[in-house]
Each structure stands twice: as C-alpha cells, then as structure tokens.
Design a protein with these regions (language model features):
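Glycine-rich phosphate/adenosyl-contacting loop at the front of the ribokinase-like
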Residues: 1-59, 64-75, 242-243, 309
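Conserved phosphate-binding/catalytic region of the ribokinase-like
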Residues: 3-4, 167-168, 172-173, 198-309
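Alpha-helix C-terminal capping segments
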Residues: 45-53, 98, 259-263
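A glycine-rich helix N-cap at a beta->alpha junction
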Residues: 72-88
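A short, aliphatic-rich alpha-helical micro-motif
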Residues: 125-129, 174-175, 209
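Conserved beta-alpha-beta core of the PfkB/ribokinase-like small-molecule kinase fold
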Residues: 133-202, 222-223
C-alpha cells in the first residue's frame, strides 16, 4: 500500500502550563521541548508506523531545523526524496502550549511550508498517480492543495483531506475530496458558520451536500460522525486520560486513509481511526506519540465499543 502525504513539516516548540494565559497574563511554563511536527509530517509518520509505504511531499528551510526534520522523518520510515529545502527560508515552526488537562493551543509560522507550490505538485504527478491515496491538510498554500486534489482526480487517485487549520475564504477544491475529515470547528469554518452554532450531525450533513464523497467529522470525546450517500452514523470515542492531544487528529486521519485504501467499511475505519487518535493522546509530542499497527490492534482488542445511530 502506497500513501502520498502532501503537506506541512514543522518543528514544534512545546511547553507545559497549568492553564492557558488570557490576554495580558504571564504564566509559568516548564518541560520546554523541540519536537518534530507539522500536520503533513505527523500524518506521514503515522501512516508509516501503521504499515503503509509512505512518501511525504513538502518543504523545509535551509536551517538546522530543516535537517533535523528530514532525518527524523527518514528514521520513522517515511520516504523523504520529495522533501526539499528552500534556500534563504526558515523551516515552519509551531508554538504549542499544553495545559493540565492535556489540551493545547497552537500558533504556527509556516516558513518554508508556504513555498510548496502547484508547480511542485505537478512535478510530483508520477507519485500521485502511483499512490493508493493522497492525504492533504491546509497548512500549505490553498492553491497547492487545490492542485494536488485536481491532479489526483485526473489520475484516479482518491484524496483524504484533513480540513485543518481552517482558512478563509474557503477554497472550493476541498469539497471535491473523496473523504473530508474536519473537526467541528473546521467544519463550521468550511460552512461559514460560527463555532458551536450547529450540532456535529448537522455539520456533517451540510458538508456532504457540498460535494465530497464522504465526510468523517472528528468530534473529540464524542467520537466521529460518518456521513455518505447512504447513511449518517456516530462512531463512539474510546475513553482515555489524555496526556497531550496535539496530534490525535493526525493519527486519526492517517489510520482512516489506510483503512479506506483497504476497502474497510467507513464506519469501521473510523473506529480504528478513533483508536489511533486515542493512543496518540497518551504520550507527549506529535510524532513520538504516533502508534504502530500492532499497538492499535492490541488497543482495539481490549475495547468494547459499538456503533450507534
């Protein structure tokens, strides 16, 4: 199985805090770390650990972080030949605060991620054509996302699009994805709605009406909503005590993509994705928390979760 991830590569600068600061407040932090991240890189590492032959198309800076990021991806089993360094450009950086409950706030400076162009994607057309699925996110320029989706459609490769972080205005290309995987805030943003103004099921229905083949909406502790032309089903979450939720959605998306390629029923695929996301919450850091296929299988074997309508 071949997965091509087209997306961001960041260095995460992470600190723990008791609570998130409000405007004008100083808070004490501790356990400061630099950890490889970026939604694209996280999803590539997750897919590789879950057993897929995974290639990442992305850009890093010609700085110390760029070298570390590429080496870390290679060590995780990701094929890095399509990752290039942009001269004179810094690598992308994410500043992450994690509170006592394991919840996070993130500020991203895109750096070289903003230099991944439609021309770069066109040059990677052979990689798109030979992939079993292309996985994308929105931490790279919207025109680059649109180009990747368009080429994938031309060559018949399915696309799984993680709609984070949300962008305005919304590029209509995301609605042509084979599977669209937003969380609730991202779903609302895609529809031009205020966060919390619609329930998860309604958001999934409304997104499906915009054109994607299916919607798998990530609803955190309330599981996932799967919507396609035949049904709408809620897939319950697994109850855990999170340490760090930073890359749970990335683990979810990678696992979902792999199960989709295998031909697994989408609701069953979402259950496996929920398990991968839950496991990713049990360790600090993005890429270090990505589970292996064996860990997901073991976790599922110890659970009793069923589908509910």
């Amino acid at each position: 199985m071949k997965i091509l991830v087209v997306g961001s590569v960041n260095m995460d600068i992470v600190a723990r805090v008791d609570h998130m600061p409000v405007a004008g407040e100083n808070v004490r932090g501790w356990d400061l770390r630099t950890i490889p991240g970026g939604k694209g890189a996280n999803q590539a590492v997750a897919a590789a650990r879950l057993g897929a032959e995974t290639t990442l198309l992305g850009r890093v800076g010609d700085d110390e972080f760029g070298g570390r990021l590429r080496r870390g991806l290679a060590d995780a089993g990701v094929r890095t030949g399509a990752i290039a360094a942009r001269p004179g450009c810094p690598s992308g950086i994410a500043l992450i605060l994690i509170d006592a409950a394991g919840q996070n706030s993130i500020v991203i400076t895109p750096g070289a991620n903003g230099r991944l162009t439609p021309a770069d994607v066109e040059a990677a057309r052979p990689l798109i054509a030979e992939a079993d699925a292309v996985v994308l996110q929105l931490e790279i320029p919207p025109e680059t996302v649109a180009a990747a989706i368009g080429i994938a459609r031309e060559v018949g490769t399915p696309t799984i699009v993680d709609a984070g972080p949300p962008r305005t205005p919304v590029d209509e290309a995301v609605f042509t994805a084979t599977v669209l995987t937003p969380n609730e805030a991202e779903a609302a943003a895609l529809l031009g709605l205020a966060p919390g103004s619609r329930g998860a099921e309604d958001l999934a229905r409304d997104l499906l009406a915009r054109g994607p083949g299916a919607v798998v909406l990530k609803a955190g502790t309330r599981g996932a909503i799967v919507a396609d032309s035949k049904r709408l089903v809620r897939v319950p979450a697994f109850m855990i005590q999170p340490v760090d939720t930073t890359a749970a959605g990335d683990a979810f998306t990678a696992a979902l993509a792999i199960e989709f390629v295998r031909g697994t029923d989408l609701a069953a695929a979402a259950r496996t994705a929920n398990a991968a996301g839950a496991l990713a919450c049990l360790k600090l850091g993005a890429q270090p928390s990505m589970p292996t296929a064996a860990e997901v299988a073991d976790f599922l074997g110890r659970q009793t979760s069923s589908l509910s309508r």
